[in-house]
Regions:
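Residues in the helix-turn-helix
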Residues: 21, 32, 46, 60
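Short, basic-rich loop-to-helix N-cap that marks the start of a DNA-contacting helix
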Residues: 40-52
Length: 70
């Protein structure tokens, strides 16, 4: 199953935040943020930190997409 973090990037724009601001607020590193920018998987711990920093739910920042072969 593929993931998309477009919702997260849209939320950052809506809140006038830069990725670097989120990295600091959530305590995540630049490498992790880059993975998310490329729609690569990250741990649930990272998602939890981001949700806590942004005061949101996981479904507010990530979409789970079906694989092409399904």
């Amino acid at each position: 199953m593929a993931v998309s973090y477009k919702k997260l990037l849209d939320l950052l724009i809506d809140r006038d935040m830069k990725k670097k601001d989120l990295e600091a607020a959530a305590g995540i590193n630049h490498y992790t943020m880059n993975k998310m920018s490329r729609d690569e998987n990250v741990t649930t711990e990272v998602l939890g930190k981001i949700c806590a920093a942004l005061n949101c739910k996981v479904e507010d920042i990530v979409d789970f997409l079906p694989d092409n072969d399904e």
